[in-house]
Amino acid sequence: MFYTCGPNEAMVVSGFCRSPPVMISGGSVFVFPCVQQIQRISLNTLTLNVKSDKVYTRHGVPVSVTGIAQMKIQGQNKQMLAAKCQMFLGKSESDIAHIALETLEGHQRAIIAHLTVEEIYKDRKKFSEQVFKVASSDLFNMGISVVSYTLKDVHDDQDYLHSLGKARTAQVQKDARIGEAKNKRDAVIREANAIQEKVSAQYMNEIEMAKAQRDYELKKAVYDIEVCTKKAESEMAYQLQVAKTKQQIEEEKMQVMVVERSQQIMLQEQEIARKEKELEAQVMKPADAERYRLEKLAEAERLQLIMEAEAEAESIKMRGEAEAYAVEARGRAEAEQMAKKAEAFQTYKEGAMVDMLMEKLPLIAEEISKPLSATNKVTMVSSGGSEIGAAKLTGEVLDIMTKLPETIEKLTGVSISQVARTG
């Protein structure tokens, strides 16, 4: 007789000529009645709800864990099929499921006892992998393959997990408040730093602008001084050149006038000569002619002297005017120089006054020594306790010179030695 089975079950034929028994998964077989026996075993996937109630963890906290496991007998694996037939042949699916469930539940309890609540709750994947690994080896020996295992639920009756959640929630809220406060603090600090940097940058910019303005004013003042100096020098040079030119023009005019006067004298002389010839040509007495000639010569000499005197006077006048203009230009230049010296004296005060005094000291010494230079004879009288001769005279002159700074200080209030030390 032929028997068939679907892919979700297997047939085991034993008896006459079937040693060892034949196992067929999803196929057909011929069985001799009365001498051979056929038995069926299910290959369906089993879904097990593995529940462990009040299992004590490593820290002694009782928890209840529920897992979902998928079991299956691999019909193509002859070794697993033979093992299952040896273990479960003749048993129903519920019996097989109960045995597998008890095995899984025992491994699940053992693994829970070695872990803490936090490890089970927070790392479910690790817990599932451990249960799957431990249970797979035992169930494989029974001919059952663990397809999958998933941790479904973890809870306890002591509100331990709830307390963990509260603590975690409080910690998260605390961290959130701390983070918010830190962010606000950092924002305020960054804003203050930004304001400080802005103000510092503004002040630095103003300082740089002030420095640039100061440098500009200083350079402009220097350039203005140079320009004014050059202008003054140019004006002085121009005025001197104008004075020289005017003087040259006046000299040329005087030379022209002298030449004109000379020409006039020559013309007069020629006229006198012509008249003399006329006299000679005329019939006159020699004496009268000689007298007339002498008179004319005297007249010509008189006119010549008058014209020469007038020319000399005009030349002297022109030269005087030119020299007066030159002296006037020089006076203006010296006045400008004195004005600049006055500005320098105003700026440097005592130093400038000392400088002026030092320039005039030689003149003062010269004036002091003038009486001595006019002395023809000096008679030295000594009482016997002091120097005599030239040494005494030199010493007295030196005493006079050394008293000059003291005299200047009394007259002007400026100490030459004090200014020299501070300068």
Swiss-Prot record:
Q: What is this protein called?
A: Flotillin-1
- Organs and tissues of expression: Normally expressed in growing retinal exons of newly differentiated ganglion cells at the retinal margin. After optic nerve injury, expressed in all retinal ganglion cells and retinal axons. Also expressed in endothelial cells, spinal cord, larval and adult skin, muscle processes, thymus and gill macrophages.
- SUPFAM superfamilies membership: Band 7/SPFH domain (SSF117892)
Query: Gene3D superfamilies in the record, alphabetically?
Result: Band 7 domain
Q: Where in the cell is it found?
A: Cell membrane; Endosome; Membrane, Caveola; Melanosome
Question: What membrane topology is given?
Answer: Peripheral membrane protein
Origin organism of this chain? Carassius auratus (Goldfish)
Subunit comment for this entry? Heterooligomeric complex of flotillin-1 and flotillin-2 and caveolin-1 and caveolin-2.
Q: Does the keyword Transferase apply?
A: no
Chief location: membrane
Q: What induces it?
A: By optic nerve injury.
